[in-house]
Amino acid sequence: MNSYQIQNQPYQQIQNTHPSFQQVQPMQVPHLQQQQQHQTMIAQQQHTPPQQHTPPQMNMIQQHTQPMLSQPQISLQMQPPSPILASQQQQQHMQSSPILASSNLTNSNNASQTTLPIITSKLLLKKEPIDQEVVNSTHKTTTTNNKPPKQSKRKEKERLEEEKQTVAQQQQYQPPFIPLASNESNSDNPFKGSHAYGVSTTPYGNSQFNNNNNNNNNNNNNNNNSNNNSNNNNGNNNINNNNNNSNNNNNNNSNNNNNNSNNNNGNNNNNNNNNNNNNNNNHNTNNNNSNSNNNNNNGYQQDKKDDYSMMIWSEVGRKINILIRTTSKATKGTPISTQEIAEAIGASNGVTADLVELIKSINDPTYVRKLPPSSISNTPTMGSQSGGMVYNSSPMLSPSTMSPILQHGNYQMGGDMYFGGNNQFSGDKQSALNNVKNSKGGNTNNSGGGSSSGGTNDTQAKKPARRRKMRYGGTELSCHTCGVTNTPEWRRGPNGAKTLCNACGLAWAKSVKSEKQKELLANSTGVNITEPKKAQKRKKESSDNNNNNNNSSDSNKVLKSDDGSNNTNLTNDDDNGYPSSPNSSNSTSPSSHNINNNNNNNNNNNNNNNNNNNNNNNNNNNNIGNNNNNNINNNNTTNSITTPTTTPFPTTIPAMQIVSQLPVMVPQTQQQPHMSGNIISFQALHQNSGYQHYK
């Protein structure tokens, strides 16, 4: 028996028991049939049923207004079908229109015998059963008029059946929800017994539902993990409250947070293994244990830090006591040794450094002074300091930047002394003397350096530089221009090879080169080309120097060159820094020697100008950070200015000039030897026909 027959049972009982169903007499009225056919034709033209828009209450009105017409209509329509089929049709219509059914049942006792057949006739006009046999043409036309409501009811039936099927499928495939209850059988294995997760007598027909269940469980477990995280964070906050005075505690708290995150990851993995409750509990206990351990560590570090700060304060107090003892002696008038003064200086520096280190340790808990051991700890009065603790850690107080007094106070206190690479002091006196000697390394023994004999540095006297006294054939060589017999190198001149000294040969070669360049330019272009500015400047300076030298040719005058050095018959440097010796017995004439000096001065002026130009170019390229170079350039330019002065002998030569150019001290009573003849400039010689040799 299907659901359709079950729904029709109550109405069939009413139909069988009610007397009106049994008293219906079939009747045939021809004019009513024609009227019905006419209505069906009109309905077919409009494609709508004739009584589609009429409400159910109109049927009740028709029962009272047309009782005589409805009865033959019923007799016509009730002939072909059987009583059971009519009851089924009436039941379907009763389901679709509940107002008619209720009115029919309530008014069944008072209604006439034609009321219920009228309802059945209306039902027959609206719906035709699928299995009904068509008897005549009139019945066929009436059934074709009611196709649209038939389709709507079919759709409604199909929708209801589909809903029933889906509900049945859900009931069939949905597994029963097994709650994660406690272990009732007290079994340690969660995958055995009736409490095992996922074990059911109903076979799983769809794996999608299983995945959904697992996802739900994982979400629940994730919520548990979030609760565990909040608990662990509370524990960390408690640790922070207990250790607000240090930064080490903050670092340890960050470590605790990392541990908590790792534990949460472990909980997620355990969710996949379906061991959620036990694992969460275990991890919570582990987190609590780790937090307690961190609390203990923080307390240990706090105690250690307190000990460290107390140790620094004790050192500060001890050093202050040293200062108080020294100052009290000084106020009383008792004599104070240099050792005590040095200890006081070291103590004051140590107090400053200790306070700086204390501030650093308070602000940064991870700060540790990793410095070499100080020499202060090796002193007799400060030997109680802990090993490895350095109290001279400030860069302002480092041995390389301290003054010699502070260095003496820190390092000359007896015992072994430690020095860096930049220190000028050492433990024993011999090494200190060697350092002092090395610091005065101006008199190095280079290949062409100056020599000294006698003077203040006799202990540091070095053997003189080697001079070439070359003999060309059997005679001794001398410069044809200046008459010098000692020169580093003999050069070619206008008279042939090895006729000029080094300085004169270079000057002559330079002049010849410039003349050749001028000739080449004049011959190539045919136009008088002006010289470059540098060449003009050099020429002007050389002419000025020559004029000044000619004007100051008296025997009681001293020529002062443009580089600031007195042009006496002392040892004068040439271009390469090699001094010439005019006082030697092999010198031919002082006048020619003075000419050589003038030439050397001119060359020096030119070199100074070149250097100044180079420095200016560098300063233009590097505008930032070259202020020192500017100062040096200014000094060079002032030195390169020609200042011809005449000073009578005896004269006092400045010590700095002597030290910078001469390694020996010159006595003040030394007089310049008389010069015979006039001083002839190099330019005048060049204007004449070649170089001449003056005796």
Swiss-Prot record:
Domain of life: Eukaryota
Positions in coiled-coil regions: 150-174
Zinc finger (GATA-type): 479-504
Composition bias type Polar residues, residue spans: 199-209, 422-433
Region (Disordered): 82-111, 134-304, 422-472, 523-646
InterPro entries: GATA_TF, Znf_GATA, Znf_NHR/GATA
Biased composition (Basic and acidic residues): 155-165
Compositional bias (Low complexity): 87-111, 140-149, 210-298, 434-446, 544-556, 564-646
Pfam (any one): GATA
CDD domains hit by this protein: ZnF_GATA
GO BP terms, alphabetized: regulation of DNA-templated transcription
GO MF entries: sequence-specific DNA binding; zinc ion binding
SUPFAM superfamilies noted in UniProt: Glucocorticoid receptor-like (DNA-binding domain) (SSF57716)
Keywords from the named record: Coiled coil, Metal-binding, Zinc, Zinc-finger
Protein name, per record: GATA zinc finger domain-containing protein 16
Species annotation: Dictyostelium discoideum
